[in-house]
Amino acid sequence: MPSLLLQLPLRLCRLWPHSLSIRLLTAATGQRSVPTNYYELLGVHPGASAEEIKRAFFTKSKELHPDRDPGNPALHSRFVELNEAYRVLSREESRRNYDHQLHSASPPKSSGSTAEPKYTQQTHSSWEPPNAQYWAQFHSVRPQGPESRKQQRKHNQRVLGYCLLLMVAGMGLHYVAFRKLEQVHRSFMDEKDRIITAIYNDTRARARANRARIQQERQQRQQPRAEPSLPPESSRIMPQDTSP
């Protein structure tokens, strides 16, 4: 029985949703300490370098990013304030002005009431539309409203249509170029075949003429030469004797 009582809190903790634990952690963090300036919000000292401020902002942004708990508006507000603090302290001129205002201001402190933090007043005055500055810092992230989703869907469809159009146009150009190349190659091969055929026919005709001439010369050499025949004796004319 005592072992069951000891295991009961652990089982209850396992059954709690993850988002609820994040909300409780955020609420406990907000109640534990309220930063009074941008340096305390980022968790750095006033003499920190720009690289230290950048690393602190990345660390804090992972802890307070709205994607960890989209249904928690307090987490979004803290992240926007963190974004504003980094925007001011990451630039040399704005940081110099902020340090001057921070050192020159002397807010009165009373036991019965607490003054509102200075960074909160500047934050409320600087991000009148909070979403505009938030989304301007992170251009790759867009609000997930129904209207924005519809516009994003239309944009994606338009881009897809352009890609398909370019692909079809590329295929058409490739086909036309291939057909043209095929015609050029075919005409070249036909011309080459015509030249080769003409050379072959000419060579064949010359070979036939040479063979006929050689055969004729050979036949002439093989025939014997005929000797000139004497006329017969009866046909010989005797010379007449003209003596007295």
Curated annotation (Swiss-Prot):
Domain named J: residues: 37-102
Keyword Transmembrane helix: yes
Entry's transmembrane regions: 159-178
Record SUPFAM superfamilies: Chaperone J-domain
UniProt feature, compositional bias: Polar residues: 103-127
Compartment list: Membrane
Domain of life assignment: Eukaryota
Record region (Disordered): 96-127, 208-244
Keyword line: Chaperone, Membrane, Transmembrane, Transmembrane helix
Membrane topology recorded in Swiss-Prot or TrEMBL: Single-pass membrane protein
GO cellular component: membrane; mitochondrion
Pfam families hit by this protein: DnaJ (PF00226)
Keyword Membrane: yes
Listed PANTHER family: DNAJ HOMOLOG SUBFAMILY C MEMBER 4 (PTHR44825:SF1), PTHR44825
Protein name: DnaJ homolog subfamily C member 4
Source organism of the structure: Mus musculus (Mouse)
Lineage, broadest ranks: Eukaryota, Metazoa, Chordata, Craniata, Vertebrata
